[in-house]
Amino acid sequence: MAIGSALSVGLIGLKAFIVQIQAFVSPGLPYFSIIGLPDTSLSEARERVKSACQASGFKWPETRVTVNLSPASMPKKGSSHDLAIAASVLSAAGAIAHDCLAGTIVLGEVNLDGTVLPINGLLPIMLHAREQGIATIIMPYANLDEARLVPDVKAIGVRHVGELIELMGGDADYRIPEATHAVNADVGATGMCPPPGDMSEVMGQHAAKWALEVAAAGGHHLMMTGPPGTGKTMLASRTPG
């Protein structure tokens, strides 16, 4: 029986909080469970993480694997915890050293082939990490340019779970698909996809556009509410900053 740990960061709106992830590998029938108030996309991380680790040359334990997300009282959303879950399982199974992730945050969504995909909300995550005195963050390679906006935090980019294993001193057997390089090349210098359009393309929505213009010009906070399909995402994607 062994326990592996890793740190991640959760978001509720723009409020960030540290998530401690512990993986427990124990005797029993093969089963992988995630507890600690995960949402649907995070619960589905079981299949993503297992497949991604196997694609990195890691032999998944033929035993019971339990992953706990703490604090249990806080809801955890999204797929940005995938890589940290993988790291905790790898640590529990002895594929990487137990102490190599101490004081390091791990972020990233993983694909079934082991590639690490970019995440959203990196800036508030990094600012919170800096406030908590955490100096190192392992993140998707495609997010590195965005990470440079926050000084005093060391950002380490990985493109594959296998690179994380090697970074932590373990042995990995993997190949980064060519499609990954093509996608990363299209992302551009900022590590983010360009805006899909211009505000001038939006018909109507005069009050909403005026509010966005005022917020962008003055650097003010802005919250948009309303039912799905009313144009919140469309307007936000066309707002600079």
Predicted regions and their residues:
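Peripheral, non-AAA+ core regions of ATP-driven protein-machinery
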Residues: 1-234, 239-240
